[in-house]
Amino acid sequence: MCTGTALPGTGSFSIKYSIISEESFFKDVDWLEKNIQLLKVRASYGVVGSDVTSGNRYLYNQVYQTGDGYYFGDYPGQTPSYKEGDLGTPHVTWEKAKKFDVGLDMNLFDKISLTVDYFHDKRYDQLVSRGDIPVIIGIGHSPNNIAETINQGFDGQISYQDRFGNFDFNTNVVFSYAKNKVKYKAEAQQKYSWLAETGKPLNQPFGYKWVGYYTPEDIVKIQSGAKDAPAVPYTDIPVQAGDLKYADLNNDGTIDDFDKGAIGKPNLPSTTLGWSFGGYWKGFSFNVLFQGSFDYSFAINGTGIESFKSQFQPIHQKRWTQEKYEKGEGIEFPRLTSNPSTINSASTYMSDFWLINAW
């Protein structure tokens, strides 16, 4: 950390209240005292810091780099030169987070255990490169402590154990649900609101919105310059019937980067579940575990799905063809093409057509 920059203080506190051990009215009621072994509420709040950074740890330093040099005199000899590199961030500090948690713990009937927590994290002073500084300044700049994100949700587990004769068993369910959002990241002012990452979840994918396939009638309108012709991509490769068709979000008649918006869900599950079951009988024991993640999207591209990538898939049999279109058959894939730069390429034109949502 650079000289003169103070490290902000961090700390935390927690409180808990165990009703069973503190309240006499529980002990005065036999059923409660017998069947509820633990009933506790707790809460905590704290500010924590992190000095983990990626790459350069000396962001506060001004960087100078070797330049192209200059020729002096009559002989061809280049004299090295130096130029400014990325501007330093003199008051860089660690990233911080305000963490709040409230929870409930219960033990019932000497068999059931329950733990549930709600959490809310506000992360701020996150190190990111500013996107709102114009490149006209002619020099790079180091990351700044400017970004802010919110993460909140709940998690917990429920356990049950019992015995039947010589057979002991236990089962356990764990769960977690969390949502996050970018509050601020100093991104450049976007021409259209749907291009902004601020206000979206972390790792939100952006791309085109698929609205169907170009039809032979669409191609006729495009070639004739009809006013109601659908928008076409900004490329030298003309579209053909059976190509994927995307929404023209700004209604300018061209499919380009200005038509990219948030598609699908982040590739980070918001919900995770797990279930385990175990038993013991006369020296034999076993355990099984199932777990899953839900509420996220992932993209399929390349050899896994695109045509002529040496991986013929069953879905390619449901591709667009003139015959299928005329017969009104179900079509689930665009026309096959070996050109990797067409509008049908997931690498060149990423869209929600290529996304799979996990519940």
What are these regions (language model features)?
Residues 1-68, 84-86, 90-359:
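Outer/extracellular conduits and scaffolds centered on Gram-negative outer-membrane beta-barrels
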Residues 71-87:
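Surface-exposed acidic, glycine/proline-enriched linker/cap segments
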